[in-house]
């Protein structure tokens, strides 16, 4: 018997699916790396994935269960098969090639492009839809970090980006839920000293851009949920005996 979770405050129900098939993935990766004489490397790669019977949450409205009607019904289902092809790039290097004094300063960055397409889509009423992206697969992902490391002092400024992607699939494209694109920026600092009792003072500030958690339904102008958390600051001291 499948699990049943009822959220009465929102009149929502989630039911498990004992008929789920395991997801199977066939992967191919090819990459090339070049290492600089000083610390650092540049890397480029391509990949291909064939995924069979991927699982995604299907959402329906006005669902009846044991005499009650729920406004939102969620159940995981095998949605079909998918093909993913993409490119991965990464670069890491300190700045000593500019001047020896800049050896303590460096940069690290990655970028991933993924093109995904669903085949044999088997949601009832949507079998003939084409050009669907695989749920949970953003097209663009990028990360970058600028750092300073000298002695016990470490400073780092980081940036992360991911484009929007399908999170849940509904009865039609109108009801598909998307996780909106995100831009995160964080800064971290720490200083470590001592030999017998190694002590580290640290501080960090996350979400400097006040990036919200946002979902939209169908099209970007139809906000489904938006939550702002502001900047989170954390500081402290660690002592190793």
Predicted feature locations:
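Outer-membrane beta-barrel domain signature
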Residues: 17-21, 76-80, 100, 129-133, ...
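Repeated loop/turn-to-beta-strand initiation elements of outer-membrane beta-barrel proteins
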Residues: 38-42, 98-100, 152-156, 195-201
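Gram-negative outer-membrane beta-barrel transporters
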Residues: 48-50, 69-166
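Surface-exposed loop and edge beta-strand positions of immunoglobulin-like domains
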Residues: 21-23, 33, 47, 80, ...
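Residues on the lipid-exposed face of transmembrane beta-strands in outer-membrane beta-barrel proteins
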Residues: 30-34, 46, 87-93, 109, ...
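C-terminal beta-signal and adjacent terminal beta-strands/loops
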Residues: 52, 105, 161-169, 190-241
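Residues that define the transmembrane beta-barrel architecture of outer-membrane proteins
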Residues: 24-28, 81-87, 138-142, 181-185, ...
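Surface-exposed extracellular loop regions of Gram-negative outer-membrane beta-barrel proteins
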Residues: 1-28, 46-74, 163-172, 206-220
């Amino acid at each position: 018997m499948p699990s049943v979770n009822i959220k009465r405050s929102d009149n929502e129900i989630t039911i498990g699916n004992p008929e789920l098939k395991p997801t199977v993935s066939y992967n191919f990766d090819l990459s090339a790396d070049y290492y600089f004489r000083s610390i650092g490397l540049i890397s480029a790669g391509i990949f291909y994935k064939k995924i069979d019977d991927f699982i995604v949450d299907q959402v329906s409205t006005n669902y009846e269960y044991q005499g009650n009607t729920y406004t939102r019904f969620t159940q995981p289902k095998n949605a079909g098969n998918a093909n993913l092809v993409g490119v991965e790039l990464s670069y890491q290097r300190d700045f000593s090639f500019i001047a020896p004094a800049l050896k303590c300063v460096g940069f690290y960055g990655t970028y991933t492009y993924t093109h995904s397409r669903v085949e044999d889509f088997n949601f009832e009423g949507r079998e003939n839809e084409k050009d669907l992206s695989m749920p949970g697969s953003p097209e663009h992902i990028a990360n970058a970090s600028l750092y300073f490391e000298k002695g016990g002092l470490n400073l780092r400024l980081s940036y992360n980006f991911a484009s929007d992607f399908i999170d849940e699939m509904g009865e039609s494209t109108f009801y598909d839920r998307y996780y909106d694109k995100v831009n995160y920026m964080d800064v971290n600092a720490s200083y470590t000293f001592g030999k017998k009792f190694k002590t580290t003072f640290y501080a960090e500030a996350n979400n400097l851009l006040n990036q919200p958690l946002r979902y939209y339904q169908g099209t970007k102008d139809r906000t489904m949920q938006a939550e702002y958390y502001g900047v989170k600051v954390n500081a402290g001291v660690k002592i190793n005996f």
